[in-house]
Amino acid sequence: MTIETLKNLLKSYKLNPNKTYGQHFLMDETILEDMIDEAKVKAGDMILEIGPGIGNLTERLLEHKVKVLSIEKDPQFLPVLKTLQKEHEDFSYELTDALKYNFSDRLKGTPYKVIANIPYYITGKIVQLFMHAAHKPDSLTLLMQKEVAYNIAAKPGSMNLIAISVQLFADARVVCVVPGHKFHPAPKVDSAVIHITLHKKPKYKIKDEAKLFRILRACFSGKRKQLHNTLENNLQLSKQVVTETLSKLKIDPMIRPQQLTIEQWLNLCDELKL
């Protein structure tokens, strides 16, 4: 899709990119096909799309003979959605806030995949929503801010809170980087496609999720500090308790939070008494 074609489409529907919703329309449709390929879409699949906008990804999906449920918050795209619904019996939509929509009830009993170009400002919340959903998707293939994508797919040495919160439940991999000039209007930062595959069976045994995330938040609030300092200062633990616990787990007290593996965090959570 050329910039001229996109502008004509926007003009025909009287649409304007909404800065409040962080709308940037992708012009390079080969990226859309790459996302569909990465998700291993096959005929009959149920696809959940968030933020269909002008419907270019939606139409590509429907060409693959899948069922698509699109969630759109911005009412200006209603004419586009109505046109798609009129032309495709396998397409349905909800005009609502994705962060408040009950996907688990709507898709109860139906396996589904999420494929979407999501606004930067809700990226983290959307990903977390599906990690903790009662009815989780098989996978998520998302176009998002490059920095966030690489944070999610981080490895020990550069781990962070969102990486751990996703990788406890799924495997994540950055597929490709999409430069800002591929969008209209062009965002100030580059984007990336990330593919997240949910674990079919739990990979990790989490005994107390609330406790685990209390520890993680406390430690990553000072991630440049050494682990023993964050545990002592942010969780009000005595130096003796911290020293003995880390020694028992054979964790270097001088290590920084981003260097720990998920297994080490889980062991630490099991040992600490808060």
Model-based region annotation:
Residues 1-218, 247, 258, 274:
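Catalytic cores of RNA-modifying enzymes
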Residues 198, 218-274:
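C-terminal lobe and adjacent flexible extensions of AdoMet/dcAdoMet transferase-like proteins
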